[in-house]
Regions:
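Extracellular/periplasmic, surface-exposed regions of secreted and cell-surface proteins
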Residues: 1-183
Length: 183
């Protein structure tokens, strides 16, 4: 559990679980005699995170000081500087991923592949207010966004000597973002 005073009453605490599993397949008996296979591991994970990326005082009444003419003099005045957001909740991201780590030829060639699917709900954003309200913006939970993709990393030791080594690497990322819902 995580707590933050930045959120509305009743939403100050969030629970963000995570778990991961890995299976080092290369340690299995049926793969022990394959000399060119250095390592093979399958990974699976799920986790949630919460964001506190808002002003610490967004859910509190704030006053701004000003000056106003009263008669022939100036007086100090105070007025609300922001309108309170309604029921502000944690922006929560849940993600699962599956990955494969592969090392070949005494670990001279390494390949890492990952697929992930991420959903962020209760997105936090400033929202414009009507001018007649007397305020310009307020913070609200505005929607849900999805992000999924595939990432690949290939690394190879081209040259290895005692005092000099040359490693070549290339990566590829295919990512797609989509606004799933606005409210």
């Amino acid at each position: 559990a995580d707590g933050s005073s930045r959120y509305s009453e009743g939403n100050k605490w969030g629970y963000f679980p995570a778990a991961a599993l890995a299976w080092r397949i290369s340690d299995e008996a049926f793969l022990k005699d394959i000399s060119w296979l250095s390592d093979l591991k399958l990974r699976l994970g799920y986790g949630e995170t919460g964001s506190t990326a808002i002003n610490p005082y967004s859910t509190l009444n704030m006053l701004s000081q000003g000056k106003a003419a009263l008669g022939s003099g100036l007086v100090t005045s105070y007025a609300p500087s922001s309108t309170l957001p309604s029921e502000l909740k944690w922006e929560t991201t849940s993600q699962w991923n599956i990955g494969l780590d592969l090392s070949l030829f005494k670990s001279r060639l390494r390949i890492t592949a990952d697929y992930y699917d991420k959903t962020t709900r209760d997105l936090l954003n400033n929202v414009s207010l009507p001018t007649s309200s007397g305020y310009t913006t307020t913070v609200k939970n505005v929607g849900k966004m999805g992000n999924r993709g595939f990432e690949l990393l290939v690394e190879g030791d081209v040259f290895q000597q005692k005092e000099f080594s040359w490693t070549l690497s290339a990566n590829l990322g295919l990512n797609k973002n989509k606004i799933k819902e606005l409210y």
